Amino acid sequence: MATVFLGTVVHTKSFSEFESFEGGFLAVDDAGKIIGVGQDYHAWASSNPAHAKGLTEVHLSDYQFLMPGFVDCHIHAPQFAQLGLGLDMPLLDWLNTYTFPLEAKFSNHQYAQQVYQGVVEATLRCGTTLASYFATNHLESTLTLAREAVRQGQRALIGKVCSNCNSPEFYVETAEESVSATLAFVEGVRKLGSPMVMPTITPRFALSCSKELLKSLGDIAKRFDLHIQSHISENLEEIEMVKGIFKTSYAGAYDEAGLLTNKTVLAHGVHLEDDEVALLKVRGCSVAHCPTSNTMLSSGLCDVQRLVSGGVSVGLGTDVSGGNSVSIQDVLLRALDVSKHLDFFKKQNIRGTGVSKTQDFNYHQLKYKQALYLATLGGAKALSLDHLTGNFALGKDFDALLVDVSVVDKPLRRLSVDELVEKFIYTGSDRNIVEVFVAGKRIKQGYQ
């Protein structure tokens, strides 16, 4: 239904540019495309009578605003089943003790259906209109995830995980099996016939794939012009193992396989070296910043400002279940926290060991509007889908959240636009996200 929303509208246009319209409007056509946005609805309607005719008006309250939907650039869908568990050990131990045994269960179709229905429901409830999902090694259950995203109306990139080495015997495949299943998955997703759900090539991480498998996956991505997702430089032990096996840097291992493209998003990037950052920029790759899991699994503090200034696109990832929440809003807060912690290290030298090479008195903390960019347009750009979604530019799909800051505790006074956004970011939850839209279709209505 063609609709015009009348009230406060906010979005970002770049990492440093936040735009808002108090008492503004946003118009959406029957196809779910944004056809008008700005301050003066009546002036727009007068100059666009054909578009304005027949629009249903929706009036927002003083405590409501429209914003773009959240983008989760990195989430492990099967690990939703162990959310909040096993976060007392570092990455490699956590994988072997908790995660690999869990993911092996997804050979059971009924179990996979139950979990995947739950994770799509939960992420949509929290305002995630676009997610980049890792599934498991299993072809059929990964197709189940794709079908579930289509059924519930979520925009998604979905990958069948590939791993043929350095994995437990009960959860490993041969390179031939991995390539065959990946090709079958790509074809299976395309047969679903939905432009909302797309396949993405997914080597789990460099350690879990042989050089031959990585190269084969790079070839498939090139042949079909596919998205690519994996992990990079999350944990110091992991990095040293990669260097020992591949005799190059972590980024170099992927680059030699043809896996670094302008459709590649790599999770974490906590310990990237300067030449790796430069390589990612040249290749047009992006990083999914996962501050929650980087903290939970004791991986480190990722310097987002360094990546952005180095020309690398950055989005946010929940990294469920290394991260303990499916909410990108929660991750947004954690990103701000990590930036403050880095500020402590760089300016206050709290290590107590004299001048540290990490010291930087010119470091600038992330601001909440910059973090909002990372959670929306930055994420869409990181996933190479910013031509479709991420903000309210004309012609894009209407992927949006209707936020109401008065749902739980009504403010004692009227708030400015900036205050509305800031209050939601710092004190809000999924309860404040009263409506969710994907491609113009209402997915959630009312507090659930």
Swiss-Prot record:
Alphabetical keyword list: Hydrolase, Metal-binding, Zinc
Q: Where are the membrane-spanning stretches?
A: none
GO biological process terms on file? dihydropteridine metabolic process; eye pigment biosynthetic process; guanine catabolic process; guanine metabolic process
UniProt organism field: Drosophila melanogaster
Reported function: Catalyzes the hydrolytic deamination of guanine, producing xanthine and ammonia. Also has 7,8-dihydropterin deaminase activity, which plays a role in synthesis of the red eye pigment aurodrosopterin.
Annotated substrate binding lies at: H76, A77, P78, Q79, R204, F205, H231, I232, S233, E234, D319
S-S bridge residues: none
Keyword ATP-binding tagged:
no
Activity modulation notes: Strongly inhibited by p-chloromercuribenzoate (PCMB). Potassium cyanide (KCN) strongly inhibits activity towards 7,8-dihydropterin but has almost no effect on activity towards guanine. Pterin inhibits activity towards guanine but has little effect on activity towards 7,8-dihydropterin.
User: Which family is this sequence assigned to?
Assistant: Belongs to the metallo-dependent hydrolases superfamily. ATZ/TRZ family.
Per the UniProt entry, the dependence of activity on temperature is:
Optimum temperature is 40 degrees Celsius.
Q: Under what name is this protein listed?
A: Guanine deaminase
GO MF annotation list:
dihydropterin deaminase activity; guanine deaminase activity; zinc ion binding
